[in-house]
Amino acid sequence: MIARGVIKTRLYESPCGTMTLGSFGDKLCLCKWHTDKHGELACRRLKRILNACLEEDTSGVIEKAAAQLNEFFAGRRRVFDVPLLLIGTDFQKTVWGELMNVPFGKTLSYGEMARRIGRPKAVRAVANANGANPVCIFVPCHRIIGSDHSLTGYAGGIDAKRRLLELEGVWPIKI
C-alpha cells in the first residue's frame, strides 16, 4: 500500500528529555518521549491507520505545540489549546478524554480514573490506555499515579513524571 498522507515530525527538547512532535493535517497526533518503549508502536499504528508516512518537517500546529510546551515548562501555561487527533480504540479515547479533564496541579489514581469512566473494575485496562497515549503532556497521563501515591510507569520515565508533577506543584504528594 502506498502512503497517501504525511505525518510531519520534528524533535522537541524539553527540560525532561527529547520528544517527537507530529502532525497530520492541522492537528497534533504525536507527542512522544524518545525513552518510550512503546513509541515505535504508536508511530506504526498512526502510519497504518492514517495511511501516511513519517517525514521530518514542521507545521503550524507543531510550532504552536512547541511554543505552548515552552510556556508550560516555563510555568506560564496550565491549559493547552492545540487541536489534537487522537488515534486509538474507543476505550482508549474514552480514557484519554477523561485524562484531559484532570486539571493542572491535580492527580488521580488509576482506580479513580476507572470509576470516572464508569468502569470501576477496569483499572488495568485504564493503565494500559494511559500507557498507549500518543500525545503525552497535551493529554496529561503524567497526572495519574498509583493508589498508594507512588509514581508508577510513565513513557518518559519516572524522573520525567516526577519533574512534571513538581512543575505542577503536586509532588511530593502531601497526605
Model-inferred region functions:
Residues 1-121, 167, 171-175:
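Basic nucleic-acid-binding alpha-helical/helix-turn surface characteristic of O6-alkylguanine DNA
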Residues 137-144:
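Short Lys/Arg-enriched helix C-cap and helix-to-coil transition segments
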Residues 99, 123-132:
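Major-groove recognition helix of helix-turn-helix-like DNA-binding domains
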Residues 103, 134-137:
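Histidine- and aromatic-rich ligand-binding microenvironments
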Residues 66, 130, 158:
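Short amphipathic alpha-helical/adjacent loop interface patches that line ligand
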Residues 44, 127, 162:
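Active-site phosphate/pyrophosphate- and oxyanion-stabilizing loops and adjacent acidic/basic residues
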Residues 147-175:
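…primarily DNA-binding HTH/wHTH and HhH modules…
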